[in-house]
Every structure is written in C-alpha cells, then in structure tokens.
UniProtKB/Swiss-Prot annotation:
It comes from Borreliella burgdorferi. This is Outer surface protein A. Keywords: Cell outer membrane, Lipoprotein, Membrane, Palmitate, Plasmid, Signal. The gene is ospA. It comes from the Bacteria. It holds the Pfam family Lipoprotein_1. GO terms for cellular component: cell outer membrane; cell surface. It is found in: Cell outer membrane; Cell surface. Residues 1-16 form the signal peptide. Its main location: membrane. The lineage of its organism: Bacteria, Pseudomonadati, Spirochaetota, Spirochaetia, Spirochaetales.
Length: 273
C-alpha cells in the first residue's frame, strides 16, 4: 500500500512539474514588467528539468516558455488560430523585447518588433516572401522615422515625424533623403542606415547675388547657408532630432543672438528664404 501511494505521489509530482507553464497564476508565479507594456509570469519554483516556467499574453494569445533564470528573460512561443507562430524573446537584462510573427513554417517572417526600455522601438513588416516592405522606428523622444513601400533593391518612401511637423522623401539602399522646398531652394536631410545625419542645400537661382549655397560641417552637424559670399544662417541638426536656426551678423562673420529651435514646417521654410 505504501509503495502504491508513493507511486501515485510521484506521478502527481511529475504531472505538477509538467503543468508549471499551463498553470501559472498569482499564487505560484511572479509578474515581471517588460518593455512594450508587456508582462511575463515567472514560476516561483523550477520544473523537473530545472528551469523556470514563463507565461505571457500578447494580443489575447498565450505564450509559454522556460528559462534558466527567474528574472523574466527567455523565449516564449505560441500558435495563432491561422497556424502562424508567435515568438517573444526577452533579453537577459530585460532591456529589450523582440516580438516576431512567422508563417506556419516557423521561418518566414510576417512582422517583427523590437522594443527597448527607453520606449524606443523598431517595427518591421514583410511580404509573402518574407522580404522587408515596411520599417517604423519610434525614437525615445517621440519622433518617428518611417520607411514604406520598400522594394527588393532597398528603394521606397521615407517620412520623419518630428515634434510638430513632418518631413517626407525617398529611400535608397544606402540612406533616406527627406526634402523641404522653398522657392528655388531645396534642403535635403540624409539619414544613413547607421543613423548618421547629414544635410545639403541646393539653389536653382540663376542670379549669383541672391543664390544660396550650403556647407555641411560633420563635426558640429551644422549646415551654414551663404549668400553672395556672406554667411547668413546656421542650421544645426541636433542629436535630439530637432533643427535649430541662428543668424549671422550683416558682415557674415559672427553668429548673433541664440539658436532657436524650429518647431513648424513654415519656420523651416522661412529659414531657407
């Protein structure tokens, strides 16, 4: 009888271990906050394999996984009704989450979103072949850079949403170019794939006395505008994804006053006049 009861107890214990992932609740787990306003439940005890059980709910889909750590890091997976697969990867230090949706084959990407603790994120969408067609990068300061209609050669459309206005342009395999036009003047802001910003100014004005030119200084991220060999304005493209404008004196030798942040598209166009 004792052997029988011992056997039953062992079976029940094994079942309990196997059910760790499917039976997590507030009593036997700890809730951990993750980037992207997600939460993961982590079992208080290890399972039979010496791992901690993980559970999270994303868009009403329950994801499950295991981890060697009890801090919430690890990989969780689930399957949608259409048989597509969802995979959530939580970094070891909990600073980033990567949410992937894949086709039934488990290899072809449908979408992918990486979210950081500072609330910045990169979201990608793919076509039927698993080729990238859209990429949205939300920065920690709330500004957004979007690439849409991406073709196989890397070309497409680009849009940057700053605090109060939007810049639009084109995308190539090497960079995004955002353009603002005012009269005969065209301001182009280039953003490389690594995030480096440069700017240039072109003027189709045929009169040399009023024709504007621009010189870029990579060290200070400044575009200096010159008219008739005199410096007139300095546009600074800051690391905070803003643009400031400051005027030169009448001689074109020294900057006057203080730099003013450009807050609207009209203000940016005025700076090009």
């Amino acid at each position: 009888m004792k052997k029988y009861l011992l056997g039953i107890g062992l079976i029940l214990a094994l079942i309990a271990c196997k059910q760790n992932v499917s039976s997590l609740d507030e009593k036997n787990s700890v809730s951990v906050d993750l980037p992207g306003e997600m939460k993961v439940l982590v079992s208080k005890e290890k399972d039979k394999d010496g791992k901690y059980s993980l559970m999270a709910t994303v868009d009403k889909l329950e994801l499950k996984g295991t981890s060697d750590k009890n801090n919430g890091s690890g990989v969780l997976e689930g399957v949608k009704a259409d048989k597509s697969k969802v995979k959530l990867t939580v970094s070891d230090d909990l600073s980033t989450t990567t949410l992937e949706v894949l086709k039934e084959d488990g290899k072809t990407l449908v979408s992918k979103k990486r979210t950081s603790k500072d609330k910045s994120s990169t979201e990608e969408k793919f076509n039927e072949k698993g080729e990238l067609v859209e990429k949205i990068m939300a920065r920690a300061n709330g500004t957004i850079l979007e690439y849409t209609g991406i073709k196989s050669d890397g070309s497409g459309k680009a849009k940057e949403t700053l605090k109060e206005y939007v810049l639009e342009g084109t995308l190539t395999a090497e960079k995004a170019t955002l353009v603002v036009k005012e009269g005969t003047v065209t301001l182009s802001k280039h953003i490389s794939k690594s995030g480096e910003v440069t700017a240039e100014l072109n003027d189709t004005d045929s009169t040399q006395a009023t024709k504007k030119t621009g010189k870029w200084d990579a060290g200070t991220s400044t575009l200096t505008i010159t008219v008739n060999n005199k410096k007139t304005k300095a546009l600074v493209f800051t690391k905070q994804d803003t643009i400031t404008s400051q005027k030169y004196d009448s001689a074109g030798t020294n900057l006057e006053g203080t730099a003013v942040e450009i807050k609207t598209l009209d203000e940016l166009k005025n700076a090009l006049r």
